[in-house]
UniProtKB/Swiss-Prot annotation:
UniProt organism field: Pichia angusta
Protein name: Autophagy-related protein 27
Gene label: ATG27
Protein origin, superkingdom: Eukaryota
One term under GO cellular component: cytoplasmic vesicle membrane
Localization per record: Cytoplasmic vesicle membrane; Golgi apparatus membrane; Mitochondrion membrane
Membrane-topology annotation of the record: Single-pass type I membrane protein; Single-pass membrane protein
Cross-referenced Gene3D superfamilies: Mannose-6-phosphate receptor binding domain
Cytoplasmic compartment segments: 214-266
Entry similarity comment: Belongs to the ATG27 family.
Length: 266
């Protein structure tokens, strides 16, 4: 009987943890294990004469780990919370007072949305009195230099949006983008050389066609294959003789037009 109860308890434990990196959706992110535990982010607002501070606590677990790290939340958060928000009001010369508690139970089923350089965990349907709250937690692949940790993007008493920029959110085969952006690869010399190579090949084909056509026309007047070969050789020599002058004229036109176009009237 015991061997049937143990797997059942493990299965129930897995379904009672929403952000659980043992879930198959995290299989492409092996470094997410580095984020196991509790994380928090706070935002403070001046509301004279008081000060309002809201703090969000996020718990990331691993039910498949033999020794899971379980950092506890503040006592004001319900025990089954895996995302919890606390609003604290402070007045001069008085102890802070907790006025609002937002809790996302670990019984909520997460929904996953994978983008190019991030993935989002959505938690929907948390109860807060007569209201319903949703949570959006975005994990962004970032280099260690651009990592920002947990960040509160938005909270409007309807949806809370959190963002976590870290290299731990990168896929196993993904390189963190520099400056937080996926930059387009720079043009290298091989691309430009390819253009000039094709232009050179095209020029050679045109010249060869011109030489053969000219030799063929001249040879038809005589009607001898021997004369055709002579005409072909003469056409090649004549074309090669005129080639330097032809290239010089093209270069002069290019550089002359380029220097004139470099200035504008003021």
């Amino acid at each position: 009987m015991l061997h049937l109860i143990t797997p059942l308890l493990l299965l129930l434990a897995r379904f009672s943890m929403a952000i659980d990196i043992s879930d198959e959706h995290f299989s492409a992110y092996p470094r997410m294990k580095e984020l196991i535990g509790s994380h928090l982010v706070s935002r403070t607002e001046e509301t004279p004469p008081s000060t309002k501070k809201i703090t969000w606590y996020l718990k990331i677990t691993d039910s498949g780990s033999g020794s899971p790290k379980d950092d506890t939340f503040p006592s004001e958060c319900p025990k089954d919370s895996q995302l919890c928000g606390l609003t604290e009001i402070s007045l001069p010369n008085r102890d802070p007072v907790i006025t609002e508690v937002f809790s996302f139970s670990n019984k909520l089923t997460p929904q996953f949305d994978v983008n190019t350089s991030s993935f989002i965990v959505n938690l929907r349907g948390a109860n807060w009195g007569a209201y319903t709250l949703d949570a959006e937690i975005e994990f962004v692949c970032a280099s260690d230099d651009n990592a920002e940790g947990l960040k509160l993007v938005k909270f409007d008493y309807s949806t809370v949006s959190l963002q976590y920029k870290t290299s731990s959110a990168c896929k196993s085969n993904e390189t963190p983008p520099k400056d937080g952006k996926n930059k387009a690869p720079k043009d290298d010399d091989s691309n430009s050389w390819g253009v000039f190579t094709w232009l050179f090949i095209l020029l050679v084909i045109v010249m060869a066609s011109y030489i053969i056509a000219q030799a063929w026309i001249n040879a038809n007047r005589v009607g001898s294959s021997h004369e055709f070969l002579n005409e072909l050789v003469e056409s090649i020599v004549e074309t090669l003789t005129k080639l330097p002058e032809f290239l010089r004229e093209i270069a002069n036109k290019l550089f002359t037009s380029g220097s004139r176009g470099g200035y504008s009237a003021v």
